[in-house]
Each structure stands twice: as C-alpha cells, then as structure tokens.
Amino acid sequence: APITATPGTDLDEDGKVKPARATASYKRAFWDAMRLNTSPMEVRNALSEGVDSEGGYLVPDEFERTLVQSLADQNIMRSLAKVIQTTSGDRKIPVVSTHGTATWLDEGKPYGESDEAFTQISLSAFKLGTFLKISEELLNDAAFNVEQYLASEFARRIGAAEEEAFLVGDGKGKPTGIFNPTGGADSGVTTAKPTDISADELIDLHYSLRAPYRARAVWLMNDATVKTVRKLKDGNGQYLWQPAITAGTPDMILGRPVYTSVFAPEVKAGARTVAFGDLGFYWIADRQGRSFKRLNELFATTGQIGFLASQRLDGKLVLPEAIKVLTQKTAG
C-alpha cells in the first residue's frame, strides 16, 4: 500500500521523532529505488524529503555511516585528521594567529594588554563524484548485496581521490593538501641535496616542530621515500627507523609513528617529501547528505544500470605551524 504518512514519523528509543533519513521506511524505499526499474508511488512518497538538487537520493543515515567508515578504512588522512560534519556551505573557523603573553609585574603596577589575535579559516563544500555500472542481471539477483557493493566501490574510488587532495590538492575546486606550498604546512628543513635525505635532516625536521605539537606528531611520506629513510643511521650507527613491536601498529622514527601514502610526493628536486606534525590540525569538513542516482536508460542496450554517487567536502590545515615538511633542494 502507498505510504501516506509524512516521512520522519518513526520514533526512536526515547520516543522522539526520527529524522526522515533515519527511518526504516526511508531506508527500504531508498534501496527499492536503487534496485527497481521504476520508482512506484510509495517509493517516491518515502523519498520526497531526501531528493538532492540534481535528482539523486540522499542515502539513509545508517548507510551514510557505513560509507564514512569505509572511507576511513581506505583513506589514511581520515584516521589522522579532525573530521567535522556540516549541514550547509562555507564553514568559518576562528583560529588563533598570535598568542597573548604574561609578564612579571611590580607591586601596584597596572596589567599590560596582551590579547590573542584571531584569523578565520573558511572550509567550503567541493563536490566529488564517481560513476559506476552494474549489470541488470546481477542487480536483480537476490543474492547480490548491492548495499555492500556500492559502499565498497564508493569508498575505494572516493577514498583515493580524497586522500590525494588532502595531501597535494591545490584548493581549486578541491581541498588544500598539507604538502601544497600555498595553504599547506610550513617548510621546516631544506635538504642539502636535491634527491637525497640524510639522518640529520630528519632529526632537524623533528625539532623544527614546536614541542607542544611533537607530543601528538606523526610522520607521513611516500612508500618510495621509506626505502631511503629505512637505511638512515644516527651518529651512533643506530637506525632511525624502529620497526613496530606489535602487529598492526605503525613503525616509528625518533619515537613517533610513521604512515605512508602513494599520494605523498616522491623524492625529487624542489619537492616537499616528508611531513611531520600533528595532523589533528588538518580539518576535513563533510557536508551531510551523500547521494546516489540511478540511471536506467543510458546503458539499456548493454543490459547495465548506471549509478552516480557524490558527496561534498573540503579539507584544510587550520594551523600551518602544527606540521612541518621536508623540502628537497632545487636542482642547479
């Protein structure tokens, strides 16, 4: 029978009205719309509050949480950075640019003014999307888990594009990466050679970061860079690289964890190759409401159904001094 009640009338455990996308009827209608050739009236009724500006359907809350977790599994930056949720466009974040100070006072002397200076960082909502196809035969197979397939493919494709932008994005229609010279991390050390890294330079990079940030700092570099770094020794002949003692935990350099990404720049003249700092000061702003849109006719002749998936997000380092990067010497 058609759904006649207003979406969102389901109650949670506390007796409060659930948001429309958190209801069982919305979830059922969403997956019916993804699987079926047409959207019957009951499906359209249930999804009326979840249609985005381009005709796609906003995913159910439960599935959105699955997508977010899948993205975290695919994208190292989501597990290291600070992730916030937004509901609309630009998000203004106040950041302290200059800290006030305390001074010693003679008895009876007035207090001097020493205010914090604030600046604002703006996080936008850039659109990131992917397109995938599934055969009608597979989609109509009751044993095929379309929810699991869409989640894994969405995470694999979107996660890779996200991670690349969070590391090297230029901020033009995409997030600003921590390795980007403009808007990214501060340069801590420049190497003596264009295509080499020394143990002393990593030690200098470590101490170029202020002590408060070192307490939660991690190293981030390309796998190819790891091959060079693992061979480095200190003045006592000890390797800087310390293999993980427990399975599943990261290796260490100078007592801090090491993470790798294929999107971190490789060693070459002028490149920013190693980051060291507190990645919690890199903020990822997820706009709520990832959406999927089914395309029935476009691939009808090949017996396939197309799906468009999209999300809006931004990422930016809100405090550049919290992360330092190693910059390779320029050639010449």
Question: Where are these predicted regions, by residue range?
Answer:
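Short loop/turn segments at secondary-structure transitions that flank enzyme active sites
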Residues: 97-102, 129, 138, 160, ...
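Assembly-associated, polar helix/coil segments characteristic of icosahedral protein shells
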Residues: 1-117, 121, 280
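Short helix/loop capping segments that flank catalytic or ligand/cofactor-binding pockets
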Residues: 95, 101-105, 114, 141-143, ...
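Intrinsically disordered, low-complexity peptide-like regions
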Residues: 8-12, 43, 50, 160, ...
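Alpha-helical scaffold segments that mediate packing/assembly in large oligomeric complexes
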Residues: 107-208, 324-332
